[in-house]
């Protein structure tokens, strides 16, 4: 596979999600990423395939609603975040502990 990495691919993928649930999902060839709020599934798939040189089987997305917090007596809210659950083809793996 050719690696035609473009700067926009780095704008789509914000960071890998390293949680207990994400670690359990990695046993089933799934990797979780925090992605840009306006990123679409085809953009996420293309970015993952180019950046990590793997084949993506499917992409599922979800939006986590921001929490309401009190800071110095003022009510505020955290931003919503978008996550992508990327299912990889058999034989392909991504080690999220290494850098891009």
UniProtKB/Swiss-Prot annotation:
GO CC annotations, alphabetized: cytosolic large ribosomal subunit
GO biological process, one term: translation
Top-level division of the source organism's lineage: Bacteria
Keywords, in A-Z order: Ribonucleoprotein, Ribosomal protein, RNA-binding, rRNA-binding
Statement: the UniProt record of this protein carries the keyword Ribosomal protein: yes
InterPro entries from the UniProt entry: Nucleotide-bd_a/b_plait_sf, Ribosomal_uL23-like, Ribosomal_uL23/eL15/eS24_sf, Ribosomal_uL23_CS
Matching Pfam families: Ribosomal_L23
GO MF annotation terms: rRNA binding; structural constituent of ribosome
General function of this protein: One of the early assembly proteins it binds 23S rRNA. One of the proteins that surrounds the polypeptide exit tunnel on the outside of the ribosome. Forms the main docking site for trigger factor binding to the ribosome.
Family: Belongs to the universal ribosomal protein uL23 family.
Quaternary structure annotation from Swiss-Prot or TrEMBL: Part of the 50S ribosomal subunit. Contacts protein L29, and trigger factor when it is bound to the ribosome.
Protein name (Swiss-Prot/TrEMBL): Large ribosomal subunit protein uL23
Source organism per UniProt: Bradyrhizobium diazoefficiens (strain JCM 10833 / BCRC 13528 / IAM 13628 / NBRC 14792 / USDA 110)
Organism placement in taxonomy: Bacteria, Pseudomonadati, Pseudomonadota, Alphaproteobacteria, Hyphomicrobiales
